[in-house]
Amino acid sequence: MSTQYYTASSIDGFIADSDNSLSWLFQFSELSGMEDEFPRFIATVGAIAMGSTTYEWIADHTGFLAEPSKWEYTVPTWVFSSRDLPRADGLDIRFVSGDVAPVHQEMLQVAEDRNIWLVGGGDLVGQFHDQGLLDEVIIGMASVTLGSGAPLLPRRIVTPPLQLLGATPYGEDFVMLRYAVRRTSET
């Protein structure tokens, strides 16, 4: 079981543009071979964590608050937020705040032998990293630059560096990069 940050990024390191839009990314959804990438990944996930900005983006773009059947995920989801957010009835969405470590322990128990997916914002992922809880970073790198926006991972990770586990190109414009997060004792 791993705690994984699975996301897409521009080559200049942004996961959303300065308007919090992902429209730049949608042009890559039809790349040959990509149709199985996300379903393969999501089949390994037993729990999800996201921040409030990601939760609100999903709510705005899917309408699941009015129609809970539009919520795409079938596993328990933890939303980290310091403020009250709208909720949808009948979904296993848990709202939490504060330290990620005790919530991570709960997620591990619920996920059993499956992975934990950290969705969206790099700051929340950074909190997991800072506590030694992040195991892998999986990035779909798109061949565009955004110039500004939401950063991929607003942390300085240089010693030890991430370990490249694999790189899979999809066409000429997109590559999936998979990294292991090394612990200081592993170098």
Predicted features along the sequence, with ranges:
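Enzymes that bind and transform nitrogen-containing heteroaromatic metabolites
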Residues: 1-187
